[in-house]
């Protein structure tokens, strides 16, 4: 038996000690988390909403009315993604893919429905009188077939004879005028119905019963309403057009009970909408967190409500408030995707309590596939002064470059990490390569080390020795000899490199500073005797000693000639 737990972006599988109660299964199940992140269309939703979120954070808290603008931008992004998903789903022949897109469309429809209702009830906070008008717009937005039927009827040659005519009756009176005259008109129509004035015309009588809000008549038209909340708004329009926000929950529960038969099971969406009608925003957020397949909705809705000053302080047990907790969960999910992780950084930035700590943990898990990506991650860390992460990234890239024998890149990363030990190691590799090949690689980097060469003694020697070669190549022998002597006296040259250094310096032995070279040669001779080097190296020492003696003699002769 195997158990598993979700980790940051991956799954942890572990062995359990449960005894199997029967034979094991023959199937291997593939488990995925946050599968929506891999949808190219839904990634547009995440990217677009990221820009809206960042813009919302820059709005001055002293101007809460401005916070109310982004909610429509969020909804327009939801609508655009949903329409694109519907178009793609209609063209796909793969049944499995089609089902997947269909499920995503259904989820986005539910998200838009809940989001729009939260706008009406919480953000716009429509008062009694105009509340019903907002609810009518809400239902019309999510019951578009009514407008389509009305358009078909009006565009037909004979609208009164169209088969959908009685389904979409149209009036010449605005809703505002209707609201003013409604009570007197309602009493008059009710009186006519009781007198059976319209009994001879079934359709006219049906319309009048609907207009006075007869519940039995409305329920008979269930197939035209399709949902209980459509039935709710219809009932309120004809029975209680000036309903108060505080009474909404009573009518919502009543309509749900009336619309659904006893055998119907209440869907999670119904519970969420009921919670909204009860103005229980915390229950809406809680149920959406459980039902929806990602944290996008609850994270952005909670942030928006927080900016509108509609959320009271609601601290959680581990110190983070609800807004921050949901944003952290959403951002952590984004970090698992190869292109969305950069969006997640901004969400962490706007979580003042735990955002930085979470970002430090997540940024270390970003796979540094390429040097370009590593530079992106590094820039993010440097902008936020995350020194530990900067050093870690640079060390990883330096080690990777060293394994690939890219010494220049490795040295550059180690300098950026300010890692003296690693810079020393790479400098040694440069010197070893020089001994083997007789030339330096990555001359541009070594020539432009600047103050960075002071990071370690070995790096300083590498830079200065390269400078010696440049002086030698430019035939500035005196300056080259002085630099070489300073390297000797500073004792920063590795002893293993003295042989190569003296061999390169032979043409300079005619200078008067040859005594320093002789002392160095004695130390080199002692080292070989102690370590028992091969005869070949000992032969080189003897040749160097011979050359040194010859050049010393020539220098003495020249000096004596000049004195006489």
Positions of PLM-derived features:
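Long alpha-helical scaffold regions
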Residues: 1-91, 391, 401-564
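Extended HEAT/HEAT-like alpha-solenoid repeat tracts in very large eukaryotic scaffold/adaptor proteins
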Residues: 81, 106-117, 131, 162, ...
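A cross-kingdom feature marking charged/low-complexity
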Residues: 122-159, 166-209, 368-389, 434-476, ...
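Alpha-helical solenoid scaffolds that mediate protein-protein interactions
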Residues: 142, 351, 362, 384, ...
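Solenoid-repeat scaffolds in large eukaryotic assemblies
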Residues: 155, 160, 169, 176, ...
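Internal alpha-helical scaffold/solenoid segments in large eukaryotic proteins
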Residues: 155, 160-164, 170, 324-333, ...
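Extended alpha-helical solenoid scaffold regions that build the rod-like backbones
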Residues: 192-397, 401, 491, 498-510, ...
């Amino acid at each position: 038996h195997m158990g598993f737990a979700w980790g940051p972006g991956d799954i942890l599988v572990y062995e359990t000690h449960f005894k199997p109660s029967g034979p094991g299964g023959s199937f291997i199940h593939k488990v995925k988390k946050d599968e929506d992140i891999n949808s190219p269309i839904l990634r547009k939703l995440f990217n677009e909403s990221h820009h809206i979120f960042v813009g919302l954070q820059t709005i001055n808290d002293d101007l809460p009315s401005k916070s109310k603008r982004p909610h429509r931008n969020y909804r327009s992004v939801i609508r655009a993604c949903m329409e694109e998903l519907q178009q793609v789903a209609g063209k796909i022949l793969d049944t499995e893919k089609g089902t997947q897109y269909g499920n995503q469309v259904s989820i986005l429809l539910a998200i838009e429905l809940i989001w729009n209702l939260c706008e009406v009830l919480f953000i716009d906070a429509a008062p009694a009188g105009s509340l019903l008008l907002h609810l009518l717009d809400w239902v019309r937005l999510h019951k578009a077939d009514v407008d389509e039927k009305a358009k078909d009827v009006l565009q037909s040659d004979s609208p009164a004879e169209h088969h959908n005519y009685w389904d979409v009756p149209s009036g010449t009176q605005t809703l505002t005028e209707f609201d003013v005259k409604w009570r007197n008109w309602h009493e008059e129509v009710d009186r006519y119905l009781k007198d059976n004035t319209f009994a001879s015309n079934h359709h006219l009588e049906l319309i009048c019963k609907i207009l006075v809000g007869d519940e039995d008549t409305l329920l008979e038209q269930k197939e035209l309403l399709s949902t209980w909340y459509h039935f709710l708004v219809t009932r309120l329009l004809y029975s209680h057009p000036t309903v108060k926000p505080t009474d909404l929950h009573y009518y919502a529960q009543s309509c749900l009970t009336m619309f659904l038969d006893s055998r119907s099971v209440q869907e999670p969406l119904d519970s969420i909408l009921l919670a909204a009608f009860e103005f229980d925003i915390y229950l809406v957020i809680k149920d959406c967190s459980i039902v929806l397949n990602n944290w996008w909705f609850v994270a952005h809705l909670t942030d928006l409500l927080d900016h509108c000053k509609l959320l009271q302080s609601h601290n959680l047990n581990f110190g983070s408030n609800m807004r921050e907790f949901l944003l952290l969960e959403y951002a952590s999910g984004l970090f698992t995707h190869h292109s969305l992780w950069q969006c997640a950084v901004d969400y962490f930035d706007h979580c003042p309590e735990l955002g930085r700590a979470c970002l430090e943990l997540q940024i270390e898990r970003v796979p540094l596939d390429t040097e370009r990506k590593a530079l992106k991650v590094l820039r993010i860390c440097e902008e936020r002064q995350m020194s530990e992460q900067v050093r870690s990234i640079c060390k990883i890239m330096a080690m990777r470059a060293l394994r690939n024998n890219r010494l220049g890149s490795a040295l550059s990363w180690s300098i950026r990490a300010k890692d003296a030990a690693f810079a020393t190691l790479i400098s040694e590799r440069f010197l070893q390569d020089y001994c083997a090949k007789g030339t330096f690689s990555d001359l541009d980097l070594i020539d432009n080390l600047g103050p960075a060469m002071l990071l370690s003694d070995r790096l300083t020697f590498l830079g200065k020795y390269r400078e010696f070669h440049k002086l030698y190549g430019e035939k500035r022998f005196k300056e080259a000899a002085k630099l070489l002597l300073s390297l000797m006296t500073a004792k920063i040259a590795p002893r293993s490199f003295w042989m190569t250094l003296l061999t390169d310096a032979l043409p300079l032995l005619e200078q008067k500073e040859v005594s320093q070279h002789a002392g160095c040669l004695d130390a080199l001779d002692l080292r070989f005797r102690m370590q028992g080097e091969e005869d070949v190296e000992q032969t080189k020492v003897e040749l160097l000693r011979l050359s040194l003696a010859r050049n010393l003699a020539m220098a003495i002769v020249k000096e004596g000639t000049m004195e006489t």
